[in-house]
């Protein structure tokens, strides 16, 4: 879920010391968004920037636009039945592109399967007023205040305790995700949501994959700056270690307030990471195919830089953990469980409060070439699970 979420004046509290308030992002003078009852009062239509936003009548005014992405608009709204504020994402013409539709279905199924404090929860899939005219998908998520990307680019001070606490929560959520036999594959600061008391939740599972799957899916380009070397080199046999690499990049960006490897393109990305971690040895390249090995051998030889010298302001224990995350060979990269048990996180680590998912996620629905109509039906059923009263309407 992209885009900033609900604004708050609350000061973030309780990672340690003075906490940062989420950056304020005023929305241009929107106090009064026109609302019209529709479909016999069962739905309300809002007109937002010339776009129709049609939700069930329990989402009463006021409604506030809080983000916009390629997929459409995100609004905050109050569910009058539960008295909970939610972020509603509208995916317009959700079934026009089969890959996009499958991505939406995957995200819904994954988030409904997962139940963890550090993973954003789906609160509702809003059913369409008429089944036969089902084109737009509305997903309501629990509402968060901001995201890590907004915090990093703001001028607010972040204490080391903040960064440590954010890292711990990312790893805690990732432990659960990996235990469900799932890779996130697109971890980046904007996919890490925060609320006013520094709670962090991982979102955007549209690119997630089963951990045992070996074919490299190229339907979407994962954000380049956080991509593990094995993905940059088109290794088809990638593992949960790809997410650990992303976490290392994100943590250093938090500590340094700028991206660690801001590559302009594929080639530049690989060069940047080798300039820091050095050219891999033949032993470290064992997992790569011959083409990838040949490519690396013809590059200039890079000597590994000292992380301690390059980042003198970062706690040496944190540096030690990051070096283990940013290991070229995924087979030697630290696992999430071992990262949680690293001395840097001793003050936060509690294995009895780091749950795993008891049932692996089943990606079987991906194995079939679903038609547009079948995908509509599957998402419609997810909506009915939240709104059984619409079953016979």
UniProtKB/Swiss-Prot annotation:
Pfam families according to UniProt: Pkinase (PF00069)
Give the free-text PTM comment from the record.
Dually phosphorylated on Thr-218 and Tyr-220, which activates the enzyme. Very low autophosphorylation, although dramatically increased when Mn(2+) is added to the reaction instead of Mg(2+).
Q: Which UniProt keywords apply?
A: ATP-binding, Kinase, Nucleotide-binding, Phosphoprotein, Serine/threonine-protein kinase, Transferase
Query: What is the reaction catalyzed?
Result: L-seryl-[protein] + ATP = O-phospho-L-seryl-[protein] + ADP + H(+); L-threonyl-[protein] + ATP = O-phospho-L-threonyl-[protein] + ADP + H(+)
Q: Which residues are annotated with the PTM Phosphotyrosine?
A: 220
Which Gene Ontology terms of cellular component type are present?
cytoplasm; nucleus
SMART domains hit by this protein: S_TKc
Starting at the broadest rank, the lineage of the source organism is: Eukaryota, Viridiplantae, Streptophyta, Embryophyta, Tracheophyta
Recount the known activity regulation: Activated by tyrosine and threonine phosphorylation.
Tell me the ranges covered by the Protein kinase domain, including all copies: 60-345
Q: Which residues form the active site?
A: 186 (proton acceptor)
Q: What top-tier enzyme class does this entry carry?
A: transferase
Tell me the domain of life: Eukaryota
Q: Which cofactor does it need?
A: Mg(2+)
Tell me which residues bind ATP.
66-74, 89
Write down the species: Nicotiana tabacum (Common tobacco)
Name it. Answer: Mitogen-activated protein kinase homolog NTF4
Which InterPro entries does the UniProt entry name for this protein?
Kinase-like_dom_sf, MAP_kinase, MAP_kinase_CS, Prot_kinase_dom, Protein_kinase_ATP_BS, Ser/Thr_kinase_AS
**Gene designation:** NTF4
